[in-house]
């Protein structure tokens, strides 16, 4: 699928990728996250080994795309020299415009929490925690952090859900 191609390119970035043509919108990362969330709700009611295995195969494509510090935003990192035009020159620089970095985080976390609740697996949850930890380190009011406000409430809602899932208050504080 197009989404799996994006994550495969992210796992192997290149300055030859024309991200704007390959990925029309900077929020395309959310499509597999929301699909996994929906499939996880199905698994809660109708356990299905084949569906669970399929979700795991999608997560196997997503996981290698995550950067070492937890950041996962393919609109920027497929081609770090020439990211998607909505992404800006550096992380978080266009968050209040069109980048959707925190929007993507929100949908990832919601999908990951639903997957964990349905399966007990931390596979997706650990990916989401790593990205949320990156956000906690890099976004906020403190010196050296990007002081930005997301354009959608999904990031804050998801961080609250991550707090409920993990008990870690730093996610609740970041949501505030």
What are these regions (language model features)?
Residues 2-7:
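Short, small-residue-biased leader/transition segments that mark boundaries at the very start
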Residues 10-27, 43-153, 157-176:
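Extended ligand-binding groove/face enriched in aromatic
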Residues 32:
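Glycine-rich, aromatic-lined ligand/substrate-binding cores of catalytic
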Residues 35:
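Aromatic-residue-lined binding/catalytic grooves and analogous aromatic/hydrophobic interfacial grooves
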